[in-house]
Amino acid sequence: MTKTERYLQLRSMIPEMRRIKRIHFVGIGGAGMGGIAEVLVNEGYVVSGSDIAQNAVTDRLCLLGAKIHIGHGADNVQQADVVVVSTAINPENPEIIAAKELRIPIVRRAEMLAELMRYRHGVAIAGTHGKTTTTSLIASLYGQAGRDPTFVIGGLLNSAGTNARLGTSRYLIAEADESDASFLHLQPMVSVVTNIEADHMDTYGGDFEKLKSTFVDFLHNLPFYGVAVVCIDDAVVREIMPRIGRHMITYGFSDDADVQALNFHQQGHQCRFTVRRKGKEDLDLLLNLPGQHNVLNALAAIAVATEDEIDDSAIIQALAEFQGIGRRFQHLGKFATPKGEVMLVDDYGHHPSEVAATIKAARAGWPDKRLVMAYQPHRYTRTRDLYEDFIEVLSQVDCLLLLEVYSAGEAPIPGADGRALCRSIRLRGQLDPIFIASPDQLAEVLPDVLQEGDLLLTQGAGNIGALSRQLAASELGFSIAATTEVKP
């Protein structure tokens, strides 16, 4: 059976959403929203959307046939049968108001994802950290095995050139977002929980116990024959395990893990390790990603693939040839500066644990390099809630350039801004950070800071990623020239 025939057979088994032909997305430029929109375009729905600015996601959707509006306006929703919104959208948005007046159904992003998953074999990946990488690895393993899954990922899968794709099989692999508790809409066949930490606590009323219980509820959305794949190395995940009334597969470095990593060794961007699985032969693996945290992500993917009887040869090849994800320890090249050549890496991590994992991976892979970090805090609330943790983690680099907080629409909070954080790190006495009041000042400061052999790490979830790419392309007047090809 050809891929086309297989897809047509699949479509005949999946009922279309009744009366729904035209779907409008408010905030379509986000990775999660754009990914769902791309799948729906390819399923034949008429898709439109709006966002405040043009970006790579909106450009790609335009090429696929979606109608994109830059800016929000009531007229944009007039022909829609349903309107999809993300949590970031203000309820007073004119398109939301117009949809309510016109009695057009308004659904959250996760509700639309749940609809896509309803008649498929869903694999949902949740957790405070590692969702995007784990989802990407699972999608790559299934693709390598010829399963041709549909996937929706919160970052660009480099090998596919996109963060979403409509496959021809019954599989749908997707991130599950706990930030607004909307992952409770999903009803997958397999659920992964990578870890649980205090983040997005406003959603849970500042109650960590409520957050933990919500993860348990998420796992109980599995059918009684479903599988929960959980990281036993995470203390909070281990704590909630007795409450999970579903079949579980555990993974980690711990001796009691069902899928265990042994003999870990990192060299540069790659890791080697042995995976031990109950009832299966050990596998010696090469992972084309740096850091122990990425080995944990790979173990989750291996556990899911092994449970679904994917051949070991596909696992071995997919991990060794994995091309990475955009903004996840993404190597952008080596560059000549006035004082010598430096290596530029860009990473999305913005929680203290994520930043710590990135620093650890950089130290392990390039132990002789001086680590220079340009860090942009993300959200005032996160900076406030995890202030002491940020002081501890950011003090671990050799040189710190600290940008002002990227607000993500939040109002400033006194004492939780970049200048205050910079002052607190300086008072700790381990590091003397440089405060960057405006992003456009970064390129002015770097030539005086960087030295021969440095590893420059741009870190954060705001517009620091765009700045990093502008640096790589020398678009900010930064007096460097690429000495190696910049990777996408």
From Swiss-Prot:
Q: Which reaction does it catalyse?
A: UDP-N-acetyl-alpha-D-muramate + L-alanine + ATP = UDP-N-acetyl-alpha-D-muramoyl-L-alanine + ADP + phosphate + H(+)
The EC designation for this entry is 6.3.2.8
According to its record, what are the GO cellular component terms?
A: cytoplasm
Give me the residues that bind ATP, please: G127, T128, H129, G130, K131, T132, T133
User: What family, per the record?
Assistant: Belongs to the MurCDEF family.
What exactly does this protein do?
A: Cell wall formation.
Supply the name of the protein: UDP-N-acetylmuramate--L-alanine ligase
Origin organism is: Shewanella sp. (strain ANA-3)
